[in-house]
Amino acid sequence: MVSSQPKYDLIREVGRGSYGLVYEALVRRTGQRVAVKKIRCQAPENVELALREFWALSSIQSQHPNVIHLEECVLQRDGMVQRMLHGSSSVLYLPLVETSLKGEIAFDPRSTYCLWFVMDFCDGGDMNEYILTRRPSRRTNTSFMLQLSSALAFLHKNQIIHRDLKPDNILVCKSRDGVDEPTLKVADFGLSKVCSSSGLNPEEPANVNKSFLSTACGTDFYMAPEVWEGHYTAKADIFALGVILWAMLERITITDTHTKKRLLGGYVQRGAQVVPVGEALLENPKLELLIPVKKKSMNRRMKQLLRQMLSANPQERPDAFQLELKLIQIAFRDFTWET
């Protein structure tokens, strides 16, 4: 069904990414506050990133409190809008799929194509902003670790490898009462991969820890050593989360060379040079990371878990389900983080 009647009122721009704008918006019928991401499809790479995000989020059959929820995706062409469905044979949708596959525009360039993603609205910025503008809090650290491990276990259970986990891509929803810890939501699935079943039993879900990918992508300071090589599985997400948790616990920061913004992220220091952890481990798999770097002491189990997550050998890292269980055990069995 094609319609020209808008369902949403855009209130203000709240974010600007590499391939789209994000607005705060209201649902006209209910007044519900939502986030709307607008992506112009004038470049094949924009189309590919947008479709990857759509395919990943639309493949999820249930919701998780720590994963951004896609309410709907609307395709707009020259003023006409249509709700986009995965696998649709729509004359508006198919040219976008062809553009993504071929790497060149497969529709009339005179037409204006846009994709609108309607998602949860998060009012607390991203994880970088939240952590780095507040005093260190054990309670917050514990809450965030449990939320992120739960989100990753959910994604891997749904055969989704994120491939670009970093604090910038983790959004914060403030608690209503201002007392409880905020809710984190993993977002930005433009580089994600939905693993499909293969082998003798196509009905059996794909094992993301045995599904090998070859496209080296992500953000260098969070990339696992095997991603730099171009042969990796979902264990690369475990490594990225290890960098995030390590940086959060010790307030380790890097500086974005373009924006000069301080970001949570781990690194290896070589003289005046700052090297991503994954790159350093690729060059020297026997490199022993200094964990903790800043704190005088760190919980023994947490220290051991971080070293496992950041192992150069992906086989030595826990999978997402093991990680979630280990963090629950650390959070609820150890009453102090200092022993």
UniProtKB/Swiss-Prot annotation:
Residues 8-332 form the Protein kinase domain. It is an enzyme of class 2 (transferase). ATP binds at residues 14-22, 37. PROSITE patterns: PROTEIN_KINASE_ATP, PROTEIN_KINASE_DOM, PROTEIN_KINASE_ST. InterPro entries: CC_SR_Kinase, Kinase-like_dom_sf, Prot_kinase_dom, Protein_kinase_ATP_BS, Ser/Thr_kinase_AS. It is found in: Nucleus. It catalyses: L-seryl-[protein] + ATP = O-phospho-L-seryl-[protein] + ADP + H(+); L-threonyl-[protein] + ATP = O-phospho-L-threonyl-[protein] + ADP + H(+). Signal peptide: none annotated. GO terms for molecular function: ATP binding; protein kinase activity; protein serine kinase activity; protein serine/threonine kinase activity. GO terms for cellular component: cytoplasm; nucleus. The active site is at residue 164. GO terms for biological process: negative regulation of G2/M transition of mitotic cell cycle; negative regulation of G2/MI transition of meiotic cell cycle. CDD domains: STKc_PDIK1L. Keywords: ATP-binding, Kinase, Nucleotide-binding, Nucleus, Serine/threonine-protein kinase, Transferase. Pfam families: Pkinase. Its EC number is 2.7.11.1. Its main location: nucleus. Belongs to the protein kinase superfamily. Ser/Thr protein kinase family. This is Serine/threonine-protein kinase pdik1l-B.
